[in-house]
Amino acid sequence: MTEVITSIQDMQRLAHDFKHDGKSIGFVPTMGALHDGHLTMMRRSVKENDVSVASVFVNPLQFAPGEDYDAYPRDIEKDTKAAESAGIDYVFHPSVEAMYPDEIGVALKVGKLAEVLEGAQRPIHFNGVVTVVNKLFNIVQPDRAYFGKKDAQQLAIVEKMVQDFNHPIEIVGQDIVREDDGLAKSSRNVYLTEQERQEAPALQKSLQLAEKLYREGERESKIIVEAVTAYLESHTSGHVDEVAVYSYPELVEQHHIEGRIFISLAVKFSKARLIDNLIIGDEEID
């Protein structure tokens, strides 16, 4: 049976004991509102580690004023049952007061990797992400941590943080998990109206169009971006926030495509901003 732990000290003691006993710890950090994407990572952690921990913590540091922090769905009972169904041993569910008892005196700041894509739209977001992930890594002390490739920029930033701060942790990227119609699973999909939900699979279809152009030999980013943008504008009622082509994981904007590239898009519907991406041109990220 899955045990819920709310105390940082209790989680640290448990992690210390597991380490002392030579057991490997797998960790899936989440903000809750669990869906099949999260559960796929949890099942993988259970398969690959002796002990598996999932965190459920809606991190205020990564939300700017006016974003959906207060509205973000919270249901720890439902999330615990879902985590238990995936075989998770422990759900770490600290309070905001436990994680941030005082005003933050020291926080991490991401460099150039956060100046593009989502980071350009949400300037404080990734600073909040790496600060909380760094804290969670210190508390849970995992051997492996699992992140979804749907947030590929986040994955690249976390991998760089682990490298720069010498965390002895293997970062495992999990393929995007999709609905039957191709929409990437996301906790924010619940915000879509019925009409928007019918339109949302166009995000993946536009990426498939980009891949088709690439496979046919197109190497000019401008042509691919224009084709994807036109497809999204004609197949959804949302506002196309961004379509861009970057190298991966360096996240340098590409004008003429060479090597591994990351095609990223964001569409803003009435109450939800959805992202999707495709990595092509070289071996997939592990």
UniProtKB/Swiss-Prot annotation:
Gene Ontology BP terms: pantothenate biosynthetic process
Matches recorded under Pfam families: Pantoate_ligase
A GO MF annotation of the entry reads: pantoate-beta-alanine ligase activity
UniProt main location, coarse: cytoplasm
Q: What else is known?
A: The reaction proceeds by a bi uni uni bi ping pong mechanism.
**What subunit structure does UniProt give?**
Homodimer.
What is the name of this protein? Pantothenate synthetase
Organism listed in the record: Staphylococcus carnosus (strain TM300)
Q: Which gene encodes it?
A: panC
